[in-house]
Amino acid sequence: RKSKFICLKKSNFQLAKSAKIILNGTIMFSDNDINGSTRQSNLRMDKDSILEIKKNFSIYYGADIILFKGAKLKLGSGFFNSNIKIRCHEKIEIGENVAISHDVTIMDSDAHEGLWEGYEKTKPIKIGNHVWIGTRVTILKGVTIGDNAIIAAGSVVTKDVPNNTVVAGVPAKVIKININWKWII
């Protein structure tokens, strides 16, 4: 299989010397924009961070992705629509056939220290296969999203999402079970 790292015009990359990109497919940072935006995509990889691409993944304009020291971001197949924001302090894993809409935020850390016993600053995030994440969703640390799930627009996901469900709300709660969805493209 051929692996490619495709960067179109509006892309900015800051990679530490010890950062690694593992390509087992193609990743494309796209500047396709139907609204005439001049927003660039940014990828910052700090010391010893790893970006792994398992298949083919597209990232549209306005992405803002940071992998902090020692963090790992693993992408299966699918796409991030415009203005995705990812803050990876530890580990974020995204499965195959995943559709993530615009203005989504995914953070595996609170980005600050808690002052109480048992507080954990970071917890990994895992997003399963065949997942559809709607516009302006926020996914917070420690969440696992099961296969074939749908996250409704505007939701804040603070707890695990079971397979074959639709969740919605702030915080997100299961509103439908035993669902199945397919692409209509």
Predicted segments, located by residue:
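A short acidic/small-residue loop/turn micro-motif
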Residues: L67-F68, D108-S109, K141, K159-D160
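Short coil/loop residues immediately preceding or within conserved phosphate-binding loops
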Residues: T122
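Beta-rich strand-turn-strand
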Residues: N83-C88, R136-I150, S155-K159
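Flexible glycine-rich beta->alpha loop in the catalytic core of nucleotide-sugar glycosyltransferases
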Residues: V104, A111-H112, S155-V156, P162
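Conserved catalytic-core motifs of eukaryotic protein kinase domains, centered on the activation segment
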Residues: D110, E117-G118, V143, I177-I179
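Domain-scale signature associated with acetyltransferase and cell-envelope carbohydrate enzymes
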Residues: R1-I106, G128-H130, D147, N163, ...
